[in-house]
């Protein structure tokens, strides 16, 4: 049916326009909706003649963010150490106790970093697409990280082809501390991957004839 074909083409055209508009706005540093990350609130601003919102640092929450990163930057500090600390202090994040998946997500988020040339070089070395010039990374602003058009969902933790854009808001965490945390996260992921690689598909299925215990790796 020709009507169905035209309807499908129209849907695809609209979808492409929406996608193009999204990437165009994201490349210019617009906040792309959603709740403000912990440590910030939003205020309305106008960028390039378009009404949008800007993240503004919340001083009390920013202090918790800095402490979180300072703690994790220590070689022996774990997720559990940090979540327990904030739970014992009665500090909530968006009204909830801090849990490990949320903590990991926050530690990876470049929205908090005071992005300088070291941050630029790090993301460049990881294969990210950097929208701004190196000279723009002055150690003042945070960043937005957007999933590139060709990035597969399974590779979302990989920075290759993801798009990094300087944001108009001020960063919270010094670049050296943020980078220490990010590299620690990357090393932990490598260790976990190596452990998974040592396990065979026969684990738990074959048992020792003498002791009866199952094969674990």
Predicted regions and their residues:
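Glycine-rich, charge-decorated loop segments at or immediately adjacent to ligand/cofactor-binding or catalytic sites
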Residues: 1
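Conserved catalytic breakage-reunion loop centered on the nucleophilic residue
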Residues: 4-217
């Amino acid at each position: 049916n020709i009507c169905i074909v035209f309807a499908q083409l129209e849907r695809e055209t609209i979808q492409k326009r929406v996608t193009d508009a999204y990437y165009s706005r994201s490349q210019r540093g617009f906040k792309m909706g959603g709740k403000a990350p912990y440590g910030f609130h939003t205020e309305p601003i106008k960028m390039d003649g378009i009404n949008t919102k800007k993240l503004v640092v919340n001083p009390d929450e920013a202090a918790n963010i800095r402490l979180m990163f300072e703690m994790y930057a220590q070689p022996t500090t774990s997720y559990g150490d940090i979540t327990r600390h904030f739970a014992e202090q009665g500090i909530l994040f968006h009204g909830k106790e801090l849990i490990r998946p949320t903590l990991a997500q926050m530690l990876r988020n470049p929205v908090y970093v005071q992005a300088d040339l070291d941050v630029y070089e790090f993301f460049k070395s990881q294969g990210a697409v950097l929208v701004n010039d190196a000279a723009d990374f002055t150690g003042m602003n945070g960043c937005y990280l957007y999933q590139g058009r060709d990035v597969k969902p399974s590779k979302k933790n990989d920075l290759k082809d993801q798009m990094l854009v300087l944001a108009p808001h001020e960063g919270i965490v010094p670049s050296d501390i943020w980078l220490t945390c990010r590299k620690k996260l990357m090393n932990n992921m490598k260790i976990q991957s190596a452990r998974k690689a040592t396990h065979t598909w026969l684990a738990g299925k074959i048992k020792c004839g003498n002791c009866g215990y199952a094969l674990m790796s």
